[in-house]
UniProtKB/Swiss-Prot annotation:
UniProt lineage: Bacteria, Pseudomonadati, Pseudomonadota, Gammaproteobacteria, Lysobacterales
CDD domains xref list: Ribosomal_L22
Organism: Xanthomonas oryzae pv. oryzae (strain PXO99A)
Keyword Electron transport listed: no
UniProt record similarity statement: Belongs to the universal ribosomal protein uL22 family.
NCBIfam families assigned to the protein according to its UniProt record, in alphabetical order: rplV_bact
GO MF: rRNA binding; structural constituent of ribosome
Protein name: Large ribosomal subunit protein uL22
Subunit and interaction comment: Part of the 50S ribosomal subunit.
Keywords for the protein's UniProt record, in alphabetical order: Ribonucleoprotein, Ribosomal protein, RNA-binding, rRNA-binding
Function statement: This protein binds specifically to 23S rRNA; its binding is stimulated by other ribosomal proteins, e.g. L4, L17, and L20. It is important during the early stages of 50S assembly. It makes multiple contacts with different domains of the 23S rRNA in the assembled 50S subunit and ribosome. The globular domain of the protein is located near the polypeptide exit tunnel on the outside of the subunit, while an extended beta-hairpin is found that lines the wall of the exit tunnel in the center of the 70S ribosome.
GO biological process annotation, one example: translation
Keyword Phosphoprotein applies: no
Source species, domain of life: Bacteria
InterPro entries named among the record's database cross-references: Ribosomal_uL22 (IPR001063), Ribosomal_uL22_bac/chlpt-type (IPR005727), Ribosomal_uL22_bac/org-type (IPR047867), Ribosomal_uL22_CS (IPR018260), Ribosomal_uL22_sf (IPR036394)
Amino acid sequence: MEAKAILRTARISPQKARLVADQVRGLSAERAVNLLKFSDKKAAHLIKKVVESAIANAENNQGADVDELKVKTIMVDEGPSLKRFMARAKGRGTRILKRTSHITVIVGAAK
């Protein structure tokens, strides 16, 4: 039994979000939420919300016990980039990419 939650186009670069995702992959759901709660990173707040949503999906849709859930899979994929322009010297311009992420969390019963 598995439950899934997805956050699309989160305004954080995938590289930064993957640093936090690697810390909680494979942990029990309760421990993952606790670890994310005390992290200072912006990605930790976003990932915590997705993990809590996946836990709620498992609890409400499948009647799973929260104590037995574990973070089976957590993926951070690249979303669409927002293109911005920054003026530079001599009339030139530089393109700035504001990157976004798709965060997917799958929780399931620990075996």
